[in-house]
Amino acid sequence: MAKEIKFSDSARNLLFEGVRQLHDAVKVTMGPKGRNVLIQKSYGAPSITKDGVSVAKEIELSCPVANMGAQLVKEVASKTADAAGDGTTTATVLAYSIFKEGLRNITAGANPIEVKRGMDKAAEAIINELKKSSKKVGGKEEITQVATISANSDHNIGKLIADAMEKVGKDGVITVEEAKGIEDELDVVEGMQFDRGYLSPYFVTNAEKMTAQLDNAYILLTDKKISSMKDILPLLEKTMKEGKPLLIIAEDIEGEALTTLVVNKLRGVLNIAAVKAPGFGDRRKEMLKDIAVLTGGQVISEELGLTLENAEVEFLGKAGRIVIDKDNTTIVDGKGHSHDVKDRVAQIKTQIASTTSDYDKEKLQERLAKLSGGVAVIKVGAASEVEMKEKKDRVDDALSATKAAVEEGIVIGGGAALIRAAQKVHLHLNGDEKVGYEIIMRAIKAPLAQIAINAGYDGGVVVNEVQKHEGHFGFNASNGEYVDMFKEGIIDPLKVERIALQNAVSVSSLLLTTEATVHEIKEEKATPAMPDMGGMGGMGGMGGMM
Protein backbone atom coordinates (compact mmCIF):
# COMPACT_ATOMS: atom_id res chain seq x y z
CA MET A 1 0.00 0.00 0.00
CA ALA A 2 1.25 3.52 -0.85
CA LYS A 3 2.49 5.73 1.99
CA GLU A 4 2.36 9.50 2.39
CA ILE A 5 5.17 11.45 4.07
CA LYS A 6 4.71 14.81 5.75
CA PHE A 7 7.60 17.00 6.92
CA SER A 8 8.47 19.57 9.62
CA ASP A 9 5.75 22.18 10.34
CA SER A 10 3.15 20.41 8.20
CA ALA A 11 3.64 17.17 10.18
CA ARG A 12 3.84 18.86 13.60
CA ASN A 13 0.72 20.96 13.00
CA LEU A 14 -1.33 17.86 12.17
CA LEU A 15 0.09 16.04 15.21
CA PHE A 16 -0.88 19.05 17.31
CA GLU A 17 -4.44 18.94 15.94
CA GLY A 18 -4.77 15.33 17.18
CA VAL A 19 -3.36 16.22 20.61
CA ARG A 20 -5.74 19.21 20.81
CA GLN A 21 -8.82 17.11 20.07
CA LEU A 22 -7.85 14.48 22.66
CA HIS A 23 -7.08 17.23 25.21
CA ASP A 24 -10.41 19.00 24.60
CA ALA A 25 -12.33 15.77 25.24
CA VAL A 26 -10.36 14.85 28.38
CA LYS A 27 -9.91 18.28 30.05
CA VAL A 28 -13.63 18.67 30.86
CA THR A 29 -13.37 15.82 33.42
CA MET A 30 -10.72 17.59 35.54
CA GLY A 31 -11.22 18.66 39.15
CA PRO A 32 -14.12 18.39 41.63
CA LYS A 33 -16.46 20.23 39.25
CA GLY A 34 -15.37 18.27 36.17
CA ARG A 35 -18.12 17.18 33.76
CA ASN A 36 -19.08 13.76 32.46
CA VAL A 37 -18.32 12.40 28.99
CA LEU A 38 -20.79 10.06 27.25
CA ILE A 39 -19.13 7.34 25.18
CA GLN A 40 -20.87 5.28 22.49
CA LYS A 41 -20.22 1.54 22.72
CA SER A 42 -20.23 -0.87 19.77
CA TYR A 43 -22.92 -2.84 21.61
CA GLY A 44 -25.11 -2.16 24.64
CA ALA A 45 -25.82 1.12 26.36
CA PRO A 46 -23.38 4.04 26.12
CA SER A 47 -21.05 4.46 29.10
CA ILE A 48 -20.75 7.64 31.11
CA THR A 49 -17.47 8.55 32.79
CA LYS A 50 -15.55 11.30 34.53
CA ASP A 51 -12.30 9.35 34.29
CA GLY A 52 -9.78 10.94 31.91
CA VAL A 53 -8.07 7.74 30.83
CA SER A 54 -11.41 6.05 30.01
CA VAL A 55 -12.23 8.96 27.68
CA ALA A 56 -8.74 8.95 26.11
CA LYS A 57 -8.86 5.20 25.40
CA GLU A 58 -11.97 5.63 23.23
CA ILE A 59 -10.53 8.29 20.90
CA GLU A 60 -9.65 7.37 17.30
CA LEU A 61 -9.38 10.17 14.73
CA SER A 62 -10.01 9.91 10.97
CA CYS A 63 -6.86 11.86 9.93
CA PRO A 64 -3.95 9.38 10.25
CA VAL A 65 -1.33 11.99 11.28
CA ALA A 66 -3.61 13.68 13.82
CA ASN A 67 -4.49 10.22 15.12
CA MET A 68 -0.78 9.44 15.67
CA GLY A 69 -0.51 12.54 17.88
CA ALA A 70 -3.63 11.57 19.81
CA GLN A 71 -2.41 7.98 20.28
CA LEU A 72 0.94 9.13 21.69
CA VAL A 73 -0.76 11.30 24.32
CA LYS A 74 -3.31 8.54 24.98
CA GLU A 75 -0.34 6.29 25.79
CA VAL A 76 0.87 8.89 28.31
CA ALA A 77 -2.53 8.88 30.04
CA SER A 78 -2.55 5.06 30.20
CA LYS A 79 1.05 4.85 31.47
CA THR A 80 0.33 7.45 34.16
CA ALA A 81 -2.77 5.50 35.25
CA ASP A 82 -0.83 2.20 35.32
CA ALA A 83 2.03 3.64 37.38
CA ALA A 84 0.17 5.95 39.76
CA GLY A 85 -3.55 5.15 39.41
CA ASP A 86 -4.52 8.78 38.88
CA GLY A 87 -3.23 11.95 37.22
CA THR A 88 -4.25 10.94 33.69
CA THR A 89 -6.06 14.21 33.00
CA THR A 90 -3.20 16.19 34.58
CA ALA A 91 -0.70 14.41 32.30
CA THR A 92 -2.87 15.09 29.21
CA VAL A 93 -3.38 18.78 30.06
CA LEU A 94 0.35 19.23 30.75
CA ALA A 95 1.36 17.41 27.53
CA TYR A 96 -0.96 19.62 25.46
CA SER A 97 0.25 22.84 27.10
CA ILE A 98 3.94 21.94 26.71
CA PHE A 99 3.43 20.90 23.07
CA LYS A 100 1.44 24.06 22.30
CA GLU A 101 4.05 26.39 23.86
CA GLY A 102 6.92 24.43 22.31
CA LEU A 103 5.40 24.38 18.83
CA ARG A 104 5.06 28.18 18.86
CA ASN A 105 8.76 28.58 19.66
CA ILE A 106 9.98 25.93 17.21
CA THR A 107 7.89 27.45 14.41
CA ALA A 108 9.60 30.76 15.26
CA GLY A 109 13.01 29.11 14.71
CA ALA A 110 14.08 27.60 18.06
CA ASN A 111 16.23 24.43 17.95
CA PRO A 112 14.01 21.47 19.05
CA ILE A 113 16.92 19.51 20.60
CA GLU A 114 18.09 22.48 22.70
CA VAL A 115 14.48 23.20 23.72
CA LYS A 116 14.06 19.57 24.80
CA ARG A 117 17.23 19.78 26.92
CA GLY A 118 15.92 22.87 28.72
CA MET A 119 12.53 21.21 29.27
CA ASP A 120 14.16 18.13 30.82
CA LYS A 121 16.27 20.25 33.19
CA ALA A 122 13.23 22.30 34.28
CA ALA A 123 11.11 19.17 34.88
CA GLU A 124 13.88 17.52 36.92
CA ALA A 125 14.27 20.65 39.10
CA ILE A 126 10.49 20.91 39.68
CA ILE A 127 10.27 17.21 40.65
CA ASN A 128 13.12 17.69 43.16
CA GLU A 129 11.20 20.60 44.74
CA LEU A 130 7.99 18.52 44.79
CA LYS A 131 9.84 15.80 46.72
CA LYS A 132 11.11 18.36 49.26
CA SER A 133 7.60 19.76 49.81
CA SER A 134 5.93 16.34 50.22
CA LYS A 135 5.00 14.82 53.54
CA LYS A 136 4.37 11.25 54.58
CA VAL A 137 0.79 10.06 54.89
CA GLY A 138 0.08 10.03 58.60
CA GLY A 139 -3.11 8.38 59.71
CA LYS A 140 -6.43 7.12 58.50
CA GLU A 141 -7.81 10.65 58.01
CA GLU A 142 -5.21 11.56 55.37
CA ILE A 143 -5.72 8.24 53.58
CA THR A 144 -9.47 9.00 53.52
CA GLN A 145 -8.77 12.46 52.04
CA VAL A 146 -6.54 11.13 49.24
CA ALA A 147 -9.00 8.36 48.36
CA THR A 148 -11.97 10.77 48.44
CA ILE A 149 -10.30 13.21 46.01
CA SER A 150 -9.25 10.43 43.61
CA ALA A 151 -12.81 9.05 43.69
CA ASN A 152 -14.10 12.42 42.41
CA SER A 153 -14.95 13.73 45.90
CA ASP A 154 -16.98 10.65 46.93
CA HIS A 155 -16.42 10.54 50.71
CA ASN A 156 -18.11 7.15 51.04
CA ILE A 157 -15.55 5.50 48.74
CA GLY A 158 -12.72 7.34 50.52
CA LYS A 159 -13.83 5.94 53.88
CA LEU A 160 -14.18 2.38 52.52
CA ILE A 161 -10.63 2.43 51.11
CA ALA A 162 -9.21 3.88 54.35
CA ASP A 163 -11.01 1.17 56.37
CA ALA A 164 -9.67 -1.53 54.03
CA MET A 165 -6.09 -0.23 54.30
CA GLU A 166 -6.35 -0.02 58.07
CA LYS A 167 -7.48 -3.67 58.23
CA VAL A 168 -4.92 -5.28 55.87
CA GLY A 169 -2.01 -2.81 55.99
CA LYS A 170 -0.20 -1.15 53.11
CA ASP A 171 1.11 -4.48 51.77
CA GLY A 172 -2.31 -6.14 51.95
CA VAL A 173 -4.31 -6.92 48.82
CA ILE A 174 -7.48 -4.88 48.30
CA THR A 175 -9.69 -6.05 45.46
CA VAL A 176 -12.79 -4.41 43.97
CA GLU A 177 -15.86 -6.46 43.05
CA GLU A 178 -19.48 -5.79 42.12
CA ALA A 179 -21.98 -6.02 44.97
CA LYS A 180 -25.30 -7.80 44.56
CA GLY A 181 -27.30 -4.82 45.86
CA ILE A 182 -26.95 -1.03 45.71
CA GLU A 183 -25.01 -0.67 48.98
CA ASP A 184 -21.20 -0.55 49.16
CA GLU A 185 -19.64 -3.18 51.45
CA LEU A 186 -16.23 -4.11 52.82
CA ASP A 187 -15.28 -7.74 53.48
CA VAL A 188 -11.97 -8.56 55.14
CA VAL A 189 -10.40 -12.02 55.10
CA GLU A 190 -7.92 -12.37 57.94
CA GLY A 191 -4.96 -14.71 57.67
CA MET A 192 -3.93 -16.54 54.53
CA GLN A 193 -6.61 -17.60 52.08
CA PHE A 194 -6.11 -19.64 48.92
CA ASP A 195 -8.61 -20.82 46.32
CA ARG A 196 -8.80 -24.54 47.07
CA GLY A 197 -11.75 -26.13 48.88
CA TYR A 198 -12.16 -29.50 50.62
CA LEU A 199 -11.64 -32.60 48.48
CA SER A 200 -14.75 -34.25 49.91
CA PRO A 201 -17.88 -32.72 51.50
CA TYR A 202 -17.61 -35.45 54.16
CA PHE A 203 -14.85 -33.38 55.80
CA VAL A 204 -17.46 -30.72 56.76
CA THR A 205 -17.85 -29.99 60.50
CA ASN A 206 -20.59 -27.33 60.19
CA ALA A 207 -23.42 -28.77 58.08
CA GLU A 208 -25.40 -25.50 58.11
CA LYS A 209 -22.58 -23.39 56.62
CA MET A 210 -21.00 -26.36 54.79
CA THR A 211 -17.56 -25.56 56.21
CA ALA A 212 -14.85 -27.60 57.89
CA GLN A 213 -13.22 -25.89 60.88
CA LEU A 214 -10.09 -27.21 62.57
CA ASP A 215 -8.84 -25.51 65.76
CA ASN A 216 -5.22 -25.71 66.96
CA ALA A 217 -4.45 -27.94 64.01
CA TYR A 218 -1.39 -29.50 62.45
CA ILE A 219 -0.76 -28.93 58.72
CA LEU A 220 0.96 -31.48 56.48
CA LEU A 221 2.48 -29.84 53.38
CA THR A 222 3.70 -31.90 50.43
CA ASP A 223 4.19 -31.37 46.69
CA LYS A 224 3.52 -35.09 46.11
CA LYS A 225 0.35 -36.84 44.98
CA ILE A 226 -0.99 -39.12 47.74
CA SER A 227 -2.82 -42.17 46.46
CA SER A 228 -1.81 -44.87 48.95
CA MET A 229 -2.71 -44.81 52.65
CA LYS A 230 0.60 -46.40 53.66
CA ASP A 231 2.40 -43.17 52.60
CA ILE A 232 0.81 -41.13 55.39
CA LEU A 233 -0.10 -43.81 57.96
CA PRO A 234 3.01 -43.32 60.18
CA LEU A 235 2.36 -39.57 60.39
CA LEU A 236 -1.37 -40.04 61.08
CA GLU A 237 -0.60 -42.34 64.01
CA LYS A 238 1.77 -39.76 65.50
CA THR A 239 -0.77 -36.90 65.25
CA MET A 240 -3.59 -39.08 66.65
CA LYS A 241 -1.53 -39.62 69.81
CA GLU A 242 -1.47 -35.85 70.35
CA GLY A 243 -5.22 -35.58 69.75
CA LYS A 244 -4.94 -32.62 67.37
CA PRO A 245 -6.79 -32.13 64.06
CA LEU A 246 -4.81 -32.39 60.82
CA LEU A 247 -5.08 -30.58 57.48
CA ILE A 248 -3.35 -32.23 54.53
CA ILE A 249 -2.29 -29.93 51.67
CA ALA A 250 -0.93 -32.01 48.78
CA GLU A 251 -0.73 -31.92 44.99
CA ASP A 252 -3.69 -34.30 45.07
CA ILE A 253 -5.21 -36.99 47.28
CA GLU A 254 -7.06 -39.72 45.46
CA GLY A 255 -8.14 -43.34 45.40
CA GLU A 256 -7.63 -45.47 48.48
CA ALA A 257 -5.99 -42.66 50.49
CA LEU A 258 -8.97 -40.27 50.14
CA THR A 259 -11.53 -43.04 50.76
CA THR A 260 -9.75 -44.18 53.94
CA LEU A 261 -9.51 -40.61 55.27
CA VAL A 262 -13.24 -39.99 54.65
CA VAL A 263 -14.28 -43.30 56.29
CA ASN A 264 -12.15 -42.61 59.38
CA LYS A 265 -13.48 -39.05 59.57
CA LEU A 266 -17.11 -40.29 59.46
CA ARG A 267 -16.38 -42.88 62.18
CA GLY A 268 -14.89 -40.18 64.37
CA VAL A 269 -11.48 -41.86 64.44
CA LEU A 270 -9.74 -38.90 62.75
CA ASN A 271 -10.41 -35.15 62.89
CA ILE A 272 -9.01 -34.41 59.46
CA ALA A 273 -9.49 -32.48 56.21
CA ALA A 274 -7.65 -32.48 52.89
CA VAL A 275 -7.25 -29.88 50.13
CA LYS A 276 -5.22 -29.59 46.94
CA ALA A 277 -2.16 -27.32 46.99
CA PRO A 278 -2.81 -23.85 45.50
CA GLY A 279 -1.29 -22.65 42.21
CA PHE A 280 0.48 -24.58 39.46
CA GLY A 281 4.06 -25.55 38.62
CA ASP A 282 6.80 -23.45 40.20
CA ARG A 283 4.23 -21.06 41.68
CA ARG A 284 2.68 -23.99 43.60
CA LYS A 285 6.07 -24.82 45.15
CA GLU A 286 6.54 -21.20 46.22
CA MET A 287 3.03 -20.98 47.69
CA LEU A 288 3.60 -24.17 49.68
CA LYS A 289 6.80 -22.60 51.03
CA ASP A 290 4.79 -19.47 51.97
CA ILE A 291 2.33 -21.61 53.96
CA ALA A 292 5.26 -23.46 55.58
CA VAL A 293 6.87 -20.16 56.68
CA LEU A 294 3.54 -18.82 57.99
CA THR A 295 2.77 -21.97 60.00
CA GLY A 296 6.29 -22.94 61.06
CA GLY A 297 6.26 -26.17 59.04
CA GLN A 298 8.37 -27.80 56.34
CA VAL A 299 7.29 -28.77 52.82
CA ILE A 300 7.86 -32.52 52.48
CA SER A 301 9.44 -32.76 49.06
CA GLU A 302 11.60 -35.42 47.47
CA GLU A 303 13.68 -32.57 46.01
CA LEU A 304 14.79 -31.90 49.60
CA GLY A 305 15.34 -35.60 50.31
CA LEU A 306 12.19 -35.84 52.47
CA THR A 307 9.52 -38.54 52.14
CA LEU A 308 6.08 -38.89 53.72
CA GLU A 309 6.91 -42.33 55.17
CA ASN A 310 9.81 -40.90 57.20
CA ALA A 311 8.24 -37.53 58.08
CA GLU A 312 8.24 -36.43 61.71
CA VAL A 313 5.67 -34.35 63.61
CA GLU A 314 8.26 -31.51 63.73
CA PHE A 315 7.81 -31.09 59.95
CA LEU A 316 4.13 -30.19 60.39
CA GLY A 317 2.94 -26.59 60.43
CA LYS A 318 0.58 -25.31 63.15
CA ALA A 319 -2.32 -22.85 63.05
CA GLY A 320 -4.80 -21.52 65.60
CA ARG A 321 -7.77 -21.91 63.26
CA ILE A 322 -8.40 -23.27 59.77
CA VAL A 323 -11.70 -22.76 57.93
CA ILE A 324 -12.40 -24.61 54.67
CA ASP A 325 -15.43 -24.26 52.40
CA LYS A 326 -16.07 -25.77 48.97
CA ASP A 327 -13.94 -23.09 47.23
CA ASN A 328 -11.44 -21.64 49.71
CA THR A 329 -9.14 -22.50 52.60
CA THR A 330 -8.30 -19.85 55.21
CA ILE A 331 -5.44 -20.29 57.69
CA VAL A 332 -5.67 -17.91 60.66
CA ASP A 333 -3.04 -17.41 63.37
CA GLY A 334 -0.18 -19.38 61.80
CA LYS A 335 2.45 -20.35 64.37
CA GLY A 336 5.53 -19.55 62.24
CA HIS A 337 8.37 -17.39 63.59
CA SER A 338 7.86 -13.68 62.88
CA HIS A 339 11.46 -13.19 61.67
CA ASP A 340 11.03 -16.03 59.13
CA VAL A 341 7.85 -14.36 57.84
CA LYS A 342 9.66 -10.98 57.60
CA ASP A 343 12.52 -12.57 55.65
CA ARG A 344 10.06 -14.22 53.26
CA VAL A 345 8.18 -10.92 52.79
CA ALA A 346 11.47 -9.12 52.01
CA GLN A 347 12.36 -11.82 49.47
CA ILE A 348 8.99 -11.45 47.68
CA LYS A 349 9.33 -7.63 47.65
CA THR A 350 12.71 -8.01 45.92
CA GLN A 351 11.12 -10.29 43.30
CA ILE A 352 8.32 -7.75 42.73
CA ALA A 353 10.87 -4.98 42.16
CA SER A 354 12.85 -7.04 39.62
CA THR A 355 10.05 -8.68 37.59
CA THR A 356 8.97 -7.15 34.26
CA SER A 357 5.79 -9.21 33.80
CA ASP A 358 2.58 -7.54 35.01
CA TYR A 359 1.01 -10.98 35.60
CA ASP A 360 3.95 -12.19 37.71
CA LYS A 361 3.93 -8.92 39.65
CA GLU A 362 0.22 -9.30 40.42
CA LYS A 363 0.68 -12.89 41.62
CA LEU A 364 3.70 -11.92 43.77
CA GLN A 365 1.70 -9.07 45.33
CA GLU A 366 -1.10 -11.52 46.16
CA ARG A 367 1.42 -13.79 47.89
CA LEU A 368 2.88 -10.81 49.74
CA ALA A 369 -0.55 -9.79 50.99
CA LYS A 370 -1.37 -13.28 52.20
CA LEU A 371 1.82 -13.34 54.25
CA SER A 372 1.46 -9.75 55.46
CA GLY A 373 -1.99 -9.83 56.93
CA GLY A 374 -4.92 -10.52 54.70
CA VAL A 375 -7.18 -9.56 51.83
CA ALA A 376 -9.91 -6.90 51.78
CA VAL A 377 -12.70 -6.94 49.20
CA ILE A 378 -14.56 -3.69 48.45
CA LYS A 379 -17.96 -4.56 47.00
CA VAL A 380 -19.33 -1.67 44.93
CA GLY A 381 -23.10 -1.27 44.72
CA ALA A 382 -25.09 0.67 42.12
CA ALA A 383 -28.60 0.92 40.71
CA SER A 384 -27.69 0.28 37.06
CA GLU A 385 -24.96 -1.42 35.04
CA VAL A 386 -23.73 1.90 33.58
CA GLU A 387 -23.44 3.45 37.05
CA MET A 388 -21.77 0.28 38.36
CA LYS A 389 -19.00 0.40 35.73
CA GLU A 390 -18.36 4.12 36.27
CA LYS A 391 -18.26 3.72 40.05
CA LYS A 392 -16.02 0.63 39.91
CA ASP A 393 -13.54 2.56 37.71
CA ARG A 394 -13.50 5.38 40.27
CA VAL A 395 -12.86 2.97 43.15
CA ASP A 396 -10.00 1.31 41.22
CA ASP A 397 -8.43 4.72 40.52
CA ALA A 398 -8.84 5.89 44.11
CA LEU A 399 -7.30 2.68 45.41
CA SER A 400 -4.22 3.00 43.19
CA ALA A 401 -3.80 6.69 44.06
CA THR A 402 -4.07 5.93 47.77
CA LYS A 403 -1.39 3.25 47.50
CA ALA A 404 0.78 5.79 45.64
CA ALA A 405 0.25 8.31 48.47
CA VAL A 406 1.27 5.79 51.12
CA GLU A 407 4.31 4.82 49.02
CA GLU A 408 5.82 8.27 48.27
CA GLY A 409 3.88 10.78 50.38
CA ILE A 410 1.50 13.65 49.55
CA VAL A 411 1.66 17.24 48.28
CA ILE A 412 -0.97 19.99 48.18
CA GLY A 413 -3.65 19.26 45.57
CA GLY A 414 -5.72 21.25 43.12
CA GLY A 415 -2.80 21.87 40.73
CA ALA A 416 -1.09 24.16 43.28
CA ALA A 417 1.85 21.82 44.09
CA LEU A 418 3.41 22.25 40.62
CA ILE A 419 3.16 26.04 40.85
CA ARG A 420 4.67 26.09 44.36
CA ALA A 421 7.54 23.83 43.24
CA ALA A 422 8.19 25.97 40.14
CA GLN A 423 8.38 29.14 42.28
CA LYS A 424 11.44 27.68 44.01
CA VAL A 425 13.24 26.74 40.78
CA HIS A 426 15.75 29.25 39.38
CA LEU A 427 17.90 27.79 36.62
CA HIS A 428 20.38 29.98 34.73
CA LEU A 429 20.26 28.65 31.18
CA ASN A 430 21.15 30.22 27.84
CA GLY A 431 19.78 30.25 24.32
CA ASP A 432 17.12 27.72 23.35
CA GLU A 433 17.65 25.74 26.57
CA LYS A 434 16.24 28.78 28.37
CA VAL A 435 13.27 28.70 25.95
CA GLY A 436 12.60 25.06 26.96
CA TYR A 437 12.84 25.98 30.65
CA GLU A 438 10.33 28.85 30.19
CA ILE A 439 7.94 26.55 28.27
CA ILE A 440 7.70 24.22 31.30
CA MET A 441 7.34 27.17 33.71
CA ARG A 442 4.32 28.41 31.74
CA ALA A 443 2.80 24.97 31.08
CA ILE A 444 2.68 23.85 34.74
CA LYS A 445 -0.01 26.51 35.39
CA ALA A 446 -2.40 24.68 33.03
CA PRO A 447 -3.81 22.05 35.46
CA LEU A 448 -4.83 24.69 38.06
CA ALA A 449 -6.28 26.94 35.33
CA GLN A 450 -8.33 24.03 33.91
CA ILE A 451 -9.66 23.01 37.34
CA ALA A 452 -10.79 26.64 37.87
CA ILE A 453 -12.38 26.89 34.39
CA ASN A 454 -14.34 23.64 34.92
CA ALA A 455 -15.64 25.08 38.21
CA GLY A 456 -16.82 28.25 36.42
CA TYR A 457 -13.98 30.62 37.38
CA ASP A 458 -11.42 32.56 35.35
CA GLY A 459 -8.33 30.32 35.12
CA GLY A 460 -5.86 33.20 34.69
CA VAL A 461 -7.18 35.12 37.71
CA VAL A 462 -7.04 32.02 39.94
CA VAL A 463 -3.46 31.17 38.86
CA ASN A 464 -2.31 34.77 39.55
CA GLU A 465 -3.94 34.74 43.00
CA VAL A 466 -2.28 31.42 43.94
CA GLN A 467 1.10 32.66 42.66
CA LYS A 468 0.93 35.71 44.96
CA HIS A 469 1.11 33.48 48.03
CA GLU A 470 3.43 30.80 49.39
CA GLY A 471 3.29 27.61 51.45
CA HIS A 472 0.17 25.46 51.36
CA PHE A 473 -2.11 28.19 49.99
CA GLY A 474 -4.26 27.07 47.04
CA PHE A 475 -7.67 27.22 45.37
CA ASN A 476 -10.60 25.07 46.53
CA ALA A 477 -12.63 24.62 43.33
CA SER A 478 -15.53 23.06 45.26
CA ASN A 479 -16.49 26.39 46.87
CA GLY A 480 -14.27 28.96 45.12
CA GLU A 481 -12.25 29.83 48.24
CA TYR A 482 -8.49 30.23 48.69
CA VAL A 483 -7.43 28.00 51.57
CA ASP A 484 -4.62 26.07 53.28
CA MET A 485 -4.82 22.92 51.12
CA PHE A 486 -3.39 20.53 53.73
CA LYS A 487 -5.84 21.75 56.40
CA GLU A 488 -8.78 21.37 54.01
CA GLY A 489 -7.63 17.88 53.01
CA ILE A 490 -7.13 18.85 49.34
CA ILE A 491 -4.08 16.72 48.62
CA ASP A 492 -2.52 14.68 45.82
CA PRO A 493 -0.06 11.79 45.97
CA LEU A 494 3.48 12.96 45.11
CA LYS A 495 3.83 9.93 42.82
CA VAL A 496 0.83 11.06 40.74
CA GLU A 497 2.19 14.60 40.23
CA ARG A 498 5.72 13.34 39.55
CA ILE A 499 4.75 10.71 36.97
CA ALA A 500 2.22 13.02 35.26
CA LEU A 501 4.91 15.68 34.73
CA GLN A 502 7.61 13.20 33.67
CA ASN A 503 5.33 11.49 31.14
CA ALA A 504 3.95 14.78 29.78
CA VAL A 505 7.46 16.19 29.21
CA SER A 506 8.57 12.90 27.64
CA VAL A 507 5.81 12.74 25.01
CA SER A 508 5.90 16.49 24.28
CA SER A 509 9.65 16.25 23.64
CA LEU A 510 9.06 13.41 21.19
CA LEU A 511 6.37 15.36 19.34
CA LEU A 512 8.43 18.57 19.20
CA THR A 513 11.51 16.78 17.84
CA THR A 514 9.46 14.96 15.16
CA GLU A 515 10.58 16.09 11.70
CA ALA A 516 8.58 13.69 9.51
CA THR A 517 5.56 11.37 9.64
CA VAL A 518 4.82 8.35 7.45
CA HIS A 519 1.30 6.97 7.09
CA GLU A 520 -0.73 4.84 4.71
CA ILE A 521 -2.85 6.57 2.10
CA LYS A 522 -6.47 5.54 2.48
CA GLU A 523 -7.76 4.12 -0.78
CA GLU A 524 -11.17 5.36 -1.75
CA LYS A 525 -13.42 2.40 -2.54
CA ALA A 526 -14.83 2.81 -6.06
CA THR A 527 -18.62 3.14 -6.10
CA PRO A 528 -20.08 0.28 -8.20
CA ALA A 529 -21.72 1.43 -11.46
CA MET A 530 -25.51 1.35 -11.67
CA PRO A 531 -26.86 -1.62 -13.66
CA ASP A 532 -28.25 -0.97 -17.15
CA MET A 533 -31.89 0.08 -16.80
CA GLY A 534 -32.55 -0.04 -20.60
CA GLY A 535 -35.14 -2.81 -20.40
CA MET A 536 -37.41 -0.63 -18.27
CA GLY A 537 -38.26 1.81 -21.09
CA GLY A 538 -41.84 0.52 -21.27
CA MET A 539 -42.55 2.11 -17.88
CA GLY A 540 -43.28 5.43 -19.60
CA GLY A 541 -46.95 4.43 -19.89
CA MET A 542 -47.29 4.60 -16.11
CA GLY A 543 -48.01 8.31 -16.34
CA GLY A 544 -51.72 7.50 -16.51
CA MET A 545 -51.61 6.31 -12.92
CA MET A 546 -51.74 9.90 -11.74
UniProtKB/Swiss-Prot annotation:
Which reaction does this chain catalyze? Answer: ATP + H2O + a folded polypeptide = ADP + phosphate + an unfolded polypeptide
The record's note on quaternary structure and interaction partners says: Forms a cylinder of 14 subunits composed of two heptameric rings stacked back-to-back. Interacts with the co-chaperonin GroES.
What general EC class does the enzyme of this chain belong to? isomerase
List positions binding ATP: T29, M30, G31, P32, K50, D86, G87, T88, T89, T90, G414, D492
Q: What is this protein called?
A: Chaperonin GroEL
One GO MF term on file is:
ATP binding
Signal sequence span per UniProt?
none
Species for this entry: Helicobacter acinonychis (strain Sheeba)
